[in-house]
Amino acid sequence: EFILNGRVKVNGKVVTELGTKINPDKDIIEFDGKKVEKVEKHVYILLNKPIGYVTTVKDQFDRPTVLDLVKIKEKILPVGRLDMYTSGALMLTNDGDFINKITHPSHEVEKTYTVTVKGIVTQDDVEKLKNGREIPVDEKSEETFVTSPAKVKILKTDEEKNFSRLQITIHEGKNREVRKMCEAIGRKVLALHRRKIADLDVKNLEIGKWRYLTDNEVKRLLELDK
């Protein structure tokens, strides 16, 4: 009825023929003189980020970004950050509400890391990490804060090669927090990999690859603090 009454335009021309085909990605559609905005479908992606990619849409130094790995038509943004030298689980989406939900500290979404450090970690070191450590807010400030209690366990120690591997679970996600926590107990980080965000695990996702989240996975993430 709207078409027959001449109320619909495509690319500036009135459409009067029923069944007219359009390309929603290219054609401009108007109804009663007002442009009809396309409602973009929300997409949710889990990426196993490699080392060497920055977590940003565009980098001022032309370094590779995570969007170079996920080439889709939707305009997606990273959910949180992983520094250039950290690999592992990173979500991307075009749903702003979802980003706020996952990244806001009040929601306390857990992130689990596998950390390889120089030296042999003791049980005393583990307790210090569990109880929270005072670390700098950033490299440019003298301001510090005490990290929230973390879940920590030793996965491996190798006295011959002089390294330890830990699993650390936090929910704050401050800038380079896990690295700074390890530095606070005198341990240099040799490798850092984010294994999980909440219950999303990248163990079966090849490094550099990505997949869409299922509806159930998105639902579980949105219900985390309910």
Where are these regions (language model features)?
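Basic, flexible Lys/Arg- and Gly-enriched helix-loop patches that mediate nucleic-acid binding at interfaces
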Residues: E1-K226
